[in-house]
């Protein structure tokens, strides 16, 4: 019913992008924690796997061994699909034997793609190839571009309904948590919401209390100045890339 990508980028940030013919997929599937890892739990989803998986990665357990232990304790593991990446970029994935075709996963350096009820294996391969080919993009946009590539390759064979993007960039709260719960074109809508977030939300979040600056920025003129700097930097970057 779903395909997703979980990734750790070169800056140590974590992200999950997911799309599905399943209402509000972002409420149950994607999970991440700064400095720890990212994961997606899907197919006949078991949301109870997420917390112990993150806890195990926080203890620097080997992801494949951790996942094996989690699945051994779940009598429904044959119906689950689960994949994750840790702070060292190590990935682990499971596609249960009772998951509905097409289903499967691929793991590459620092990321994993997994899906079920898909049009075919080309969906996860296109998603993975796109992510690998677009390292120059901002992390969130790179994830969205990969998701769109999977959609173009066939996506969920039942159709479209929901999509989500979750990114942690080193703080105890997400840098982005965008969800499209029910839409005719969820990935396009997710991209639109991401574009809207660039206007003020993303630069504003950089002014919030953080690990480095526990009180954040409270002077509104300084906040507006930061927003202007953010857009100036984006404009300069686009001109360099043109």
Region spans (language model):
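N-terminal nucleophile
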Residues: 1-242
